[in-house]
Design a protein with these regions (language model features):
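A hydrophobic C-terminal alpha-helical subdomain
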Residues: 94, 99-110
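Charged/polar positions within long, soluble alpha-helices
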Residues: 154-158
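Contiguous beta-strand/loop segments that form the cofactor/metal-binding neighborhood of enzyme cores
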Residues: 1-81, 85, 109-111, 118-135, ...
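Hydrophobic, well-ordered secondary-structure elements that form the walls
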Residues: 125, 142, 159
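All-alpha amphipathic helical-bundle segments outside canonical DNA-binding/catalytic cores
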Residues: 137-141
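Conserved beta-strand->loop/alpha-helix structural units within folded catalytic cores of enzymes
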Residues: 142-149
Length: 172
């Protein structure tokens, strides 16, 4: 599997500090040769609330809230499907992807890709073009999100060396 993923690591973890915020995140991707389900996940930690991606496919994520009694801190939450906000023709792509033959990798089949975000991102981009406005995410934000993953992998390949995002990806 190493040649397929161009990585000697079956699992990669990135620890991220958000710009001008007390929020940090842990991103985990388990790819191969591990006794667990395939997983791409993000856990976000803040001083008031924290969000943890489900450990098992099909389970619900957990929202932790500070200043509660210990047993009440964690609560499973349902993440709503916002397909109804999309044009009818693409609503079905938020829960399961429809791809060509041979494209059955779990990153495609679990929720249409990244939790069903792909149709929302595509629709937002098209709507922004039609309205002649900047989309969300814009080019800088998209570069920030993409570079985060690239730099996380580079960091792993360099023994965990800290990597900083390039200036063109940071808020103006």
């Amino acid at each position: 599997m190493i040649p397929i993923y161009n990585s000697p690591f079956a699992v990669e973890t990135a620890h991220i500090k958000f710009h001008k915020s007390d929020v940090s995140a842990r991103i985990i991707r388990s790819l191969f040769d591990t006794a667990r389900q395939y997983r791409e996940s993000i856990d976000v930690y803040g001083s008031k609330q924290s969000f943890e991606w489900p450990l098992i496919e099909g389970e619900e994520p957990v929202l932790h809230t500070a200043k509660k009694a210990e047993p009440e801190i964690p609560a499973k939450v349902k993440v709503p499907d916002y397909a109804h906000r999309l044009p009818k023709e693409i609503q079905r792509f938020t829960t399961k992807g429809v791809y060509g033959e041979g494209e059955d990798h779990l990153s495609f089949t679990q929720g249409g890709g990244h939790g069903g975000s792909h149709p929302h991102l595509a629709n937002e981009f098209i709507q922004a073009l039609l309205a002649k406005r900047e989309p969300f995410p814009n080019a800088r934000q998209s570069a920030n999100w993409t570079c985060t993953g690239i730099l996380a992998h580079e960091s792993a390949m360099a023994g965990g060396e800290i990597r900083k995002l390039p200036a063109f990806t940071l808020p103006a």
